């Protein structure tokens, strides 16, 4: 499970459309809201914010709730 999330985050951070198409069967389908939240977390992570701060930016009260939503 953690490996799948790691692949997804790496794809969002460094991947291309072609990378997504090649890996689409190995990563979970995301809704438009989940995609925007993934991109938001990556943008915030660049500024070295704490995980809890990142989760509050996407309206998550608990860090674990945020992880579940991003899956």
Curated annotation (Swiss-Prot):
The keyword rRNA-binding does not apply. Component of the COP9 signalosome complex (CSN), a complex involved in various cellular and developmental processes such as photomorphogenesis and auxin and jasmonate responses. The CSN complex is an essential regulator of the ubiquitin (Ubl) conjugation pathway by mediating the deneddylation of the cullin subunits of SCF-type E3 ligase complexes, leading to decrease the Ubl ligase activity of SCF. It is involved in repression of photomorphogenesis in darkness by regulating the activity of COP1-containing Ubl ligase complexes. Keywords: Cytoplasm, Developmental protein, Nucleus, Phosphoprotein, Phytochrome signaling pathway, Signalosome. Component of the CSN complex, probably composed of CSN1, CSN2, CSN3, CSN4, CSN5 (CSN5A or CSN5B), CSN6 (CSN6A or CSN6B), CSN7 and CSN8. One of its GO terms (cellular component) is cytoplasm. This is COP9 signalosome complex subunit 7. GO terms for biological process: red, far-red light phototransduction. Belongs to the CSN7/EIF3M family. CSN7 subfamily. Phosphorylated. It is found in: Cytoplasm; Nucleus. It comes from Brassica oleracea.
